[in-house]
Amino acid sequence: MDRYEAMEQRRAEVQAMLHPDGGQPLGGSGGSAGADLAPDVSDMMLTVIQGGVYGRPQLDIKTRAICTVAALIATDGGRYLENWIGNALNVGWSKEEIVEVISQLAFYCGVPNSVNAYGAAKAVFDARGL
């Protein structure tokens, strides 16, 4: 198995953890304009990120998910933030922990970004009945 094939295999494992219901991430299978317009590039990005970076042993998937949530809060990641809040819940973060991360970041990433993040979190929590 070559390196890219190994990353594709690890990507499938990561996807199973992040999306235990079999759902597709944003950016995969038509979930974003990029996936629609350049599916090969979208697929390659997901394989490298989730199969390469997420496959490294230094951090577990739970830690990587909350790091991604924090980065998306800091950069006002829009609909990707909702996706990753859902992923964080899927790998074991609680509603209360996610809200606390948003609160912590208000003072470092800006109140407007945190207000947007609270809205994204509420949408995810409401959709899941939390």
Segments predicted by a language model, with ranges:
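Acidic, glycine/proline-rich low-complexity segments that act as flexible tails and inter-domain linkers
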Residues: 1-61, 115-130
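N-terminal alpha-helical segment
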Residues: 46, 63-66, 81, 98
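Short, structured motif recognition centered on aromatic/hydrophobic residues
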Residues: 64-72, 102
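Short, hydrophobic/aromatic alpha-helical segments in well-folded domains
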Residues: 84, 101-104
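Short, flexible active-site loop motifs that bind/organize anionic cofactors or intermediates
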Residues: 54, 88, 104
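Extended intrinsically disordered, low-complexity coil regions enriched in Ser, Thr, Gly, Ala
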Residues: 77-97, 113-124
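A short structural micro-motif
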Residues: 73, 91, 104-111
